[in-house]
Amino acid sequence: MRREVMALVAVLAGAVEAFPRAARAQATGVPSFNAPYRAFQRSELGAVFSFPEGGGTAFEGVYRYAHGKFDIGLRGGFFSPGNGANTVVLAGVEARQRVITHTMDFPLDGALMVGAGANLVSGGSALIIPAGLSLGRRIDPQGSTVSIVPYVQPTFAFIVGDFPSDLVFGFGVGADFRLSRVLDARISGGLGDRPLTGVSIGGVWVH
């Protein structure tokens, strides 16, 4: 099972590296995407590290909670571009709604993802409004306590700010790993349009 997990992580990282013009597509503009399932009954709390292609590191705290058929996520943190550039403040909100359940004819589950967020920095602030569809399916390997949700998330994002507005398309690729009843590990990356590409790695405590 460990070999299977490591192989999947390597494939995801390699796919992101193979496409040099990927987009940041989520609410705060980092390549952190979402599986079609929520991993929690009430809420989850965790952290995400993102590594854009151009350098620098983003760190975000994330909190997501159930609200009827929706779950709503709040995220905020900082992006440090390095090379003496100003640190960017990140803040955003996301919502997920399950809209597709797998059948004999269509083997994937799906959820609609929408959000809004901001990158705040002097002379380069941006408002990001993404909308996408996450498609995937949970895999429960026999004899293992670890389950995996590989998924894709095609996403459009409207970006407006201290520069000409733009509509970009990103193709998210990721996997969620249920390591225990209370712990999830996550990796994702974006393919598609610029401005940024990279990978995100996170962990959450689920309740």
Residue spans of the language-model regions?
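Mid-chain, structured segments of secreted extracytoplasmic proteins
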Residues: 71-106
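Outer-membrane beta-barrel transmembrane domain signature
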Residues: 28-35, 52-55, 103-105, 113-207
